[in-house]
Amino acid sequence: YCGTVSLCIHDKKESKTAGYNFCHSCGRTSTLKNIQKHLARFVRIKRMNRISIQAVAEHRPETEKWLLAYDCYQIEIIELASIIEVLFRDYFEALLFISCESKKDSFLEKIVRKYTGNDFMNIEKTNDIYKKAFGIEIRKNLNAETWDDLLDIVNLRNMIVHNNGQVDKRFESTSTFRRWKDRVDIPLIKIEDEDIAKLLSSVIDAVTIISNLYLKEYYQRRNRVIANYYFNKENAYDFFADTE
């Protein structure tokens, strides 16, 4: 997952084949496990937030809950946006590196990061990047509600981070504003606990679907690397000697 690809032949019998569950170069586990850790952190943050909100609500019963929880819900949306970025960027880089030379290339990594920049925080640009690089159209594999929820998470996150959680002209130009306009109480936007639950559900759906798309593409590209390794060895006798 860091761009290092190695061939480790464990056994010639198919029934005994095995593989590492981590990268022996950088120590990272899979992108999916990394996302699972992010989701676990989100659950911890959400749990602590709900305890805090309940405690404050008992002392401020006259204040609407969404106002008391405004900052808490913003933190949770930012965390969901981080999960989305990890999902798209890490899977993209893993597929790209295994498609290239079977070794880490720092120059290639710099080119990728320079070209993509923060594009993986833009859902529509992400769809375009995957389509151009791998022929994968993410949008076609997600239902309309999930796609819109991902857009909403990122647009809300941008408003929260860049304008202190207050509705601005840039946010008003987004599709999210059109879907949430009944929630707007200038300069704030009304976010409820149910909204967070719905957005989380869509993130989990997206993680599941995109992870399956990734695995299908990954195995195909991995097998090409392995086949290319064997069929392009300089000396066929060396190949058979290595397998003895």
Feature map (PLM): residue ranges:
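Short, hydrophobic, well-ordered secondary-structure elements
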Residues: 70-96, 161
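Short, charged, low-complexity loops and linkers
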Residues: 25-30, 66-70, 107-113
